Amino acid sequence: MKPDAAQVKTFLLQLQDSLCQQLSAVDGAPFIEDAWQREGGGGGRSRVLREGRVFEQAGVNFSHVHGDAMPASATAHRPELAGRSFEAMGVSLVVHPLNPYVPTSHANVRFFIAEKPGADPVWWFGGGFDLTPYYGFEEDAVHWHRTARDLCLPFGEEVYPRYKKWCDDYFYLKHRQEQRGIGGLFFDDLNTPDFDHCFAFMQAVGNGYADAYLPIVERRKATPYGERERHFQLYRRGRYVEFNLVWDRGTLFGLQTGGRTESILMSMPPLVRWEYDYQPEPGSPEAALSEFIQVRDWL
């Protein structure tokens, strides 16, 4: 079947609505919408929930940009895209909870298509979701990965292991030699066997995120915590910032190609701290995190 960008856009808009409704239902606070236009073509809807009871900040962004030609930075690696008009659309979200016992989560799903008269379109899907705990709970990690595996199973037994490994490899801070969190799923350049199959998988990932994350939020949101836990949460959020600004391809691409800065940096935590040569107390729950986030088979 010929790729249908309009169908993908309809799903993405519905997904943004659904995710905002579900997150608001947990927190009680509303999302504030900021609709924006891109000078070169397209625009989006950025929605942010701030200073809620459960979520210190949650951002759910939809964007749909298009143009007559790809930026040089994009065609350098993919010469087949030169001279083509393009459309890129997606939903991305990051949730930074207030309670340190609730993990931070990130998800995105996206679609890209480039066309020119007389030639087949070049298109692909990408996306995934990943979890960044501050205090590790095995039952949460198992639930997260089981949900990821179960949504992958209808598409083949090999899908979950492949995209789990890609996620582990991608969300790695080389300068710290540590994982960002416990991973999940990550896929890109997905265009086989056909459009319908790939679109169905992207929808499964987009819809599966809430099933993976919200039960963990409900389980941990009322856990008592104090200054020590909050201190550690803010310190570990520094790793999130480091990854996004140093290693994340999407962030770097957006900033280098004149993307909308406010939307790109919506993933940043509202508060964060660094501490020179911080060492957690041996044997403490804080010290246990480095072992917990090591790559492993959670299932």
Curated annotation (Swiss-Prot):
InterPro entries from the UniProt entry: Coprogen_oxidase_aer, Coprogen_oxidase_aer_sf, Coprogen_oxidase_CS
Subunit architecture: Homodimer.
Cofactor list: a divalent metal cation
Name assigned to this protein: Oxygen-dependent coproporphyrinogen-III oxidase
Domain of life: Bacteria
Gene Ontology CC annotations of this record: cytoplasm
Gene responsible for this protein: hemF
Keywords from the named record: Cytoplasm, Heme biosynthesis, Metal-binding, Oxidoreductase, Porphyrin biosynthesis
E.C. designation(s): 1.3.3.3
Positions of the UniProt region annotated as Important for dimerization: 240-275
Catalytic-site annotation from UniProt: H106 (proton donor)
Site label Important for dimerization, positions: H175
Keyword Oxidoreductase: yes
Organism phylogeny: Bacteria, Pseudomonadati, Pseudomonadota, Gammaproteobacteria, Enterobacterales
Amino-acid positions noted as binding a divalent metal cation in the UniProt annotation, renumbered to this chain: H96, H106, H145, H175
Source organism per UniProt: Klebsiella pneumoniae subsp. pneumoniae (strain ATCC 700721 / MGH 78578)
Family designation: Belongs to the aerobic coproporphyrinogen-III oxidase family.
Presence of the UniProt keyword Zinc in the record: no
Pathway: Porphyrin-containing compound metabolism; protoporphyrin-IX biosynthesis; protoporphyrinogen-IX from coproporphyrinogen-III (O2 route): step 1/1
UniProt record, GO biological process: protoporphyrinogen IX biosynthetic process
Annotated binding of substrate, by residue: S92, N108, V109, R110, G258, G259, R260
Catalytic activity: coproporphyrinogen III + O2 + 2 H(+) = protoporphyrinogen IX + 2 CO2 + 2 H2O
